[in-house]
Amino acid sequence: MILESVSKEPKGRESVAGRVKGLFNRGRNIQALALSFGLALSLGSNGVRADINTVPLVAPLYHGGDLLQKQLFKGLELSVTTGRDLAIFSVAGMSLDAYILTLPLDAPTKARVIARLSDPFYSIPLGHFLYLFYDRYSRAENRDQFRDYLLSQYSKEQIAPWQHSLFSLEEQVKDNTEPTVEANDRREGMTLNRQLVAMLVTVYDRLFNNDDWALGKKLPEHYRYLGDSPEDLALIADIQPLIINEIGKYVGSLPEGDMRSALELIIEDGKAENAAKVNNKAQAITVTLIDFVRLNVLKAYRQYALPAQRAKAFSAWMQASLKEDPKGLSDFLASWSQRPRAVQITVDGLSQGLMQALVAPNSGPYLKEVLARDAVLSQLSPASAMGRPQHTPKQDFLRQLVKNGVTDQYYLPFFKSLYRRSENGIATGGISSTPTISVRNLPIIKTGAAVSGKGGTGIPNFHFVDRTRDRAYYFFGNDALQLENLAESRGMRTMFDRLNYLKTLNCNAQYDWNAQTSFDALVNLGLGEAIRDFGEQRCLNELSLRAEAEKGLQHSVAAVREQLEAYDRMGAWRLFSRMSLRAKLNEQLNELALLSEQAMPDYLLIYNPWPDHFAHFKGPFSDEIIAPTGELNRLDYWLGRLDKVYRDAGIYPQTLWGMAGDHGLAPVYHTLNPELVLQDALKQRGVELKISKISSDEGEGPKITNNLNPPSLHGVDLVIASTAGGNYMLDFFNSDRGWQVQPLYQELTRFKVREGKALDMVSLFADELQESLDYLVVRQSDCTLDSCSVRLVGYRNGQRRDEMISRESGVIRYQALDAKGAPELLALAQSNPYLAPLSDVQLSAKQQLLELCLGSAKGCSAEQWRSLAAMSPRPDAVVQLAHLYDEDRAGTINLFPKEGFGYNTLVPGRHAGEHYLEKDAFIGFWGETVKPGQRLGPLDNGSLAPTLYQYLTGEQVEVGDNGWGYPSVLSSLN
């Protein structure tokens, strides 16, 4: 049996026809459209747009909005029936039925799947689901290409000193098994083997076996996650034994480690005697896998069907335009081929200060200060410390940089060129949102949405308690699949949502539902440790294929324009010649439309998690991160290859590039668990509290939560959760105004522990943790988007300091509450030891701001506070903490540890805190159109997406409108 399904293209590129509704208002005149867009353009920003004749930015039809967004691709409907009469579908180079026969399926399942392949409603989605998880992810060879590159540039003698736990000169293992790691190396990885694919096929078959859940004739606009309806519960009960059985098979292929241990606990919960257990992990993982399979079936089919629908719509419009206005069509194609493109790169843990220091080690004190503090902090023995990280970082390269510098042409060549050519486009200090944690900051960077308010992400931390649902979330585990659903429920719009009329590509980033082509974030995270360069290889392979198609497309556009000019010159009396040429042009336009969908994207989003991921386990300044064999040079290698693809494709001149990090990282020398300190303090007072810990310690394994039957928090006195070593969040429930209301400072000072007895919980934490605690932050008043007051409590020189930050009507005040002079917890008067000393002009400006903002009761604007804090060790601290509790789910008390301490961690790298090394995030823009007159100053990392959006669309971005939480800085780039 041969399934009729996909493509004539050998590289897996599909061509699919489909219905298109509401394509094009045929009465609309092309030249009128161009004129109207030109008028709109003249009313745009005065910055970049003012010099428009020098910027290949004007795509008057394709990007004017009216044509592409409102007419051409409006109303596209994606249906399964589209693909019923297609060519042969193949997976792994063989027909779908032949591939199914190779999988380790049980005999009844294999027979049933083979028999059902004749049903297109069953087989076509299955084929594209498998294409997503096999061909797309197996297209590249699983070799460490960065390693190969290094060995081609260095001799083994040159590279030998920079070997470390992530890089060895020994020959690589050729298969996909886990590499051997040291006992305290807590990295986790998984492999994409046939057993896993078989499990996914088995789940798919059971879901579709009775046609209870099928795609039908029209794909849904949004995925509906499983709930507690009778139908959903029956489906879960039917699938769960299958899932547990398949997990049992899969566990056998995993090495010993946290991943395997977690799966074995799930199998235990699958036993009949545990069926009624609260937070049953077998049911939890069943729900997660069903949602994962169904969600990715939909994604895979949407990504298969959409390009063909778009191509058909584009072809139909061009053929209609040919008939009505051939010259206008030619002008359109000329403009369209020069349309703007954008590349958005998000790198976990990328710090501007560190990168600038590495490309120019002698330009400032950064690296010397890191090494000097390491020498001091590593030798301290704090009385309150409970231990040290399990791994001691190897920092040989850091020492060489400080002692001798480096003149290695193969070390960070891309970043060196970037700082040399485009330094003004790189912010002097990128600002990470507090707490400086990825789950909070990544959606900010990717979408430009704020955390709170309409259109916000609604995700304040790596964990939170939703009091309205009586539900705790922790996103290292299966709750990660809930992130998109949670953000969407708050109205967050991704760049893919906003640009769904453009050609888009996602490489390894979450929040990708509307991406036209996507490489899954969770797959990359799961496989990228065991198979280095896994996601990067596949993304670059896809782009390389598209670059070749782009060059072919540009040749096709030129050829079609020549034919259009000939057609336009041809007299009306040459009727048959015109008809013949028009028929030929219609065929060429159809081919051009198909080719355009295979060419380079208008918008590309790339996410790279590895600099942060390994910095936690190895240390932020370890050889594993900063050496020539480390993660930052690996990142540099892939950025260089990406740059080359865009240059080879011929579209570099019209491409705006933007890159941001979500935070930096700081080293940990001493570890402490605040809940253990709390328990000892309560025991001494004869008090017991019911405490629920919802997070893993940094370096531990994931947690599984049953979304349909999570543990209730009613009756719990305190919920605790830690984040990345640098933030510790507590939720209390003792407000006089109800369980769902966040308690204020005064309520926490009289926390009832038993009849007639109360504790001052703020003082308890501040006093017991004073050696390790930088400060804690608690609500002084209720917080809204319009106003808030927070109290900071910490110790300095043995004295408790109580300080308050309040904001009202755009004015922020920061003051001491103990009448002991100016506030000092945020160290605004101090200089930043990692940066060059302030000039006389800067010192004068800082003194004026100190007097203005701290010397009077009037307060300052957010911009003034930002300018002041930029000249201190804690960038933007006042503004960030003033907005810490904009989101009600941001906890009751947040603890931030001192430099060198890590709360609830086993590893030597931390973030989520308030120190410069954690707050300093990279954000920068470059490209041939970027020519800022002066360097960008302190800038939120959330400005990345709005700037690229404005460049692509010409639309103004207004903070607070249309879901934007951060401003565009496009006008500052020219």
Where are these regions (language model features)?
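His/Asp/Glu-rich, glycine-adjacent segments
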Residues: 119-123, 127-128, 132-135, 141, ...
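Bacterial N-terminal signal peptides
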Residues: 32-42
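N-terminal secretory signal peptides that target proteins for export/translocation
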Residues: 1-25
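Low-complexity, glycine/alanine/valine/leucine- and proline-rich hydrophobic stretches
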Residues: 898-935
